[in-house]
């Protein structure tokens, strides 16, 4: 039962991430909803990794360029699932 609740909670957090909620909100939710232990640590690590991932990078060709132009006024390059501003793929 607890495993089902954790999976449902995790899927709900993934669904809500498209609404503009930040990683710290999810970390706080995990802190209060999941008992302390190894499972909480694993979920917090997964939330942190998903929070750093930019899913638009491989799906949309100009995502990184638009992202980097807004932030640093540099050309953007997609490195896996992350955008790197001003760092071409050769590095």
Curated annotation (Swiss-Prot):
GO cellular component assignments: extracellular region
Organism domain of life: Eukaryota
Record-linked PROSITE patterns: BSPN_CSAB
Domain BetaSPN-type CS-alpha/beta: 54-91
GO molecular function (one): potassium channel regulator activity
N-terminal signal peptide: 1-19
Prodomain residues: 20-27
Cell compartment(s), UniProt: Secreted
Tissue: Expressed by the venom gland.
InterPro entries: Long_scorpion_toxin_alpha/beta
Family to which the UniProt record says this protein belongs: Belongs to the long chain scorpion toxin family. Class 1 subfamily.
Job of this protein: Inhibits voltage-gated potassium channel.
Protein name: Potassium channel toxin BmTXK-beta-2
């Amino acid at each position: 039962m607890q495993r089902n609740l954790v999976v449902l909670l995790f899927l709900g957090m993934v669904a809500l991430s498209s609404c503009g909620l930040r990683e710290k909100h999810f970390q706080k939710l995990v802190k209060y909803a999941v008992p302390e232990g190894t499972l909480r640590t694993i979920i917090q690590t997964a939330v942190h990794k998903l929070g750093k991932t930019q899913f638009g990078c491989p799906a949309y060709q100009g995502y990184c360029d638009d992202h980097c132009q807004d932030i640093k006024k540099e050309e953007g390059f997609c490195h896996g699932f992350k955008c790197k501003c001003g760092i071409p793929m050769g590095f």
